[in-house]
């Protein structure tokens, strides 16, 4: 089946978060994103979302650099000739170094279109079989421990299957101790976002007593070696996030013993195809995976749901309900959580309708790119 993309629309959106979200890197009150729409010659649309942030705190990519890469390099490559399978794009994009979030946004839109043309849900096109997925929730650093406990209480009452608490050197052991005292049985993990160094090994080891599911990305994003030195010192499994940008990164991390769990983020690794390859590798190695979040709007959230239906996604992910972040999302129906589960949509493609009225409301500017007559 050949997919002939007639044109691509890039939209720059800005959405206000319902509440500020704080990590060891800073506080977010709004999310800028690029929404990618690809339209074939029959007028069928596929949707993707760039998860890059406005500033390069998570990686070197930003919304502005993603727009530049999409406009000047990636969109022309996608429009150059028909596409028979979305994974062909990774070969077309191979000459472009890094810029994984930009690549993933465009590839994701093509995956959505591909699944719609097949008449199957995106989850099925990827090889997933789950009807429901377990989800957890990520909670940013709060003004006080009392505030944090109130937030956790609210999400536990809503049935979330796992609680993730952001930590940093001034907000870690004592905070987790109090959380565990109040919630002794809640599946709990800590996310450091690279806030520590190997010098802090004893401090990180102090977290062992709290029975955490994992500690996520304690050390620098580019340091697999020190993570390999740290893991044997801890009872708590290390989960790598920012360190894993590709299949090869995952392979090296597992070979070195840098982690026991991997967080797969579609944007960080360059698309659904690479995410699936990493999933398959981890399944072979006996390393569980889960799907992390990047404050996605509805389109990105739908892609996360689809990839999480693969068999080795055995730990609850960060794909919380739309209402956790937004007053109004850009999809209908919005993503809802019931009893800690999200029902996987069974409609073709991402399974949700894009709410064009809301998209228009959030759009700051847009640009259309047409296929040339020779393409």
Swiss-Prot record:
GO molecular function: isomerase activity; magnesium ion binding; O-succinylbenzoate synthase activity
UniProt entry keywords in alphabetical sequence: Isomerase, Lyase, Magnesium, Menaquinone biosynthesis, Metal-binding
Residues noted as binding Mg(2+) in the record, renumbered to the chain: 191, 216, 241
Pathway entry: Quinol/quinone metabolism; 1,4-dihydroxy-2-naphthoate biosynthesis; 1,4-dihydroxy-2-naphthoate from chorismate: step 4/7; Quinol/quinone metabolism; menaquinone biosynthesis
Cofactor note (record): Shows highest activity in vitro with Co(2+) and Ni(2+).
Residues annotated as catalytic: 166, 265
GO biological process, one term: menaquinone biosynthetic process
Function, in words: Converts 2-succinyl-6-hydroxy-2,4-cyclohexadiene-1-carboxylate (SHCHC) to 2-succinylbenzoate (OSB). Also acts as a N-succinylamino acid racemase (NSAR) that catalyzes the racemization of N-succinyl-D/L-phenylalanine. Can catalyze the racemization of a broad range of N-acylamino acids, including N-acetyl-D-methionine, N-formyl-D/L-methionine, N-formyl-D/L-norleucine, N-formyl-D/L-aminobutyric acid, N-formyl-D/L-norvaline, N-formyl-D/L-homophenylalanine, N-carbamoyl-D-methionine and N-carbamoyl-D-norleucine.
Similarity comment text for this entry: Belongs to the mandelate racemase/muconate lactonizing enzyme family. MenC type 2 subfamily.
Full protein name: o-succinylbenzoate synthase
Organism of derivation: Geobacillus stearothermophilus
